[in-house]
């Protein structure tokens, strides 16, 4: 490895600092591999009970939708950035992220823009309605038609579009649906996507508008507070 530093007159050299960082080798130089079995702090039976309870809340009319999840943990050795690189290759998405905070790292991928603000307008792109890609154009066409006519998928989509409208209405005026149930194709799935947008009110601001849309309805359910 050869390092060359080009400096203008009066600039402070940093070549030694760079050499020190390289020689410290404070990064994993070996491949990534898992250690032991994955586990979750929530057992299968507990999670099934949560699902049954969620169904009862829906049947009673307490909520329209509940989004249940549980965390899985997996010990590993190696460079986790390799997992992120594999994710980019296996599941390319419009939004990929990798944050290194020193003591922990967060990475993932998503097709969804939760909330975008530009030139005084805020928009939310609800995604609800999903079918797997088959690799065959004709099969994908049939799955798209099935998706567009599925009562459950359409009901969920309508709910999330209305939720986006409600969230934006807190801080926006002239809220509208820019496009509705647009079919979008990704590497592994077919999605139904809509866009709801509005003009930020003079007495509000982008930060408040953005914060008041959290959490995403696709992650919380609806009504948000009751569902969570």
Range-by-range predicted roles:
Residues 1-228:
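Extended alpha-helical targeting/anchoring segments
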């Amino acid at each position: 490895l050869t390092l060359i530093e080009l400096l203008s007159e009066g600039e402070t050299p940093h070549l030694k600092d760079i050499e020190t960082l390289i020689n410290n080798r404070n990064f994993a130089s070996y491949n990534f591999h898992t250690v032991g079995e994955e586990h979750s702090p929530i057992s299968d039976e507990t999670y099934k009970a949560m699902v049954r309870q969620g169904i009862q809340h829906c049947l009673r009319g307490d909520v329209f939708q509940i989004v249940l999840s549980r965390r899985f943990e997996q010990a590993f050795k190696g460079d986790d950035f390799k997992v992120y690189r594999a994710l980019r290759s296996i599941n390319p998405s419009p939004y990929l992220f990798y944050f290194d905070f020193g003591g922990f790292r967060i990475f993932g991928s998503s097709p969804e823009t939760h909330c975008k603000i530009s030139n005084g307008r805020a928009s939310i792109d609800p995604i609800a309605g999903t079918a797997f890609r088959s690799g065959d154009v004709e099969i994908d066409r049939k799955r798209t038609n099935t998706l567009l006519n599925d009562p459950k998928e359409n009901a969920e989509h309508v709910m999330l579009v209305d939720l986006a409208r409600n969230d934006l209405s807190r801080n926006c005026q002239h809220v509208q649906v820019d496009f509705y149930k647009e079919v979008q194709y990704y590497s592994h799935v077919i999605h139904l996507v809509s866009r709801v947008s509005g003009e930020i009110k003079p007495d509000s601001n982008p930060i408040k508008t953005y914060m008041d849309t959290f959490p995403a309805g696709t992650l919380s359910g609806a009504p948000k507070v009751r569902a969570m």
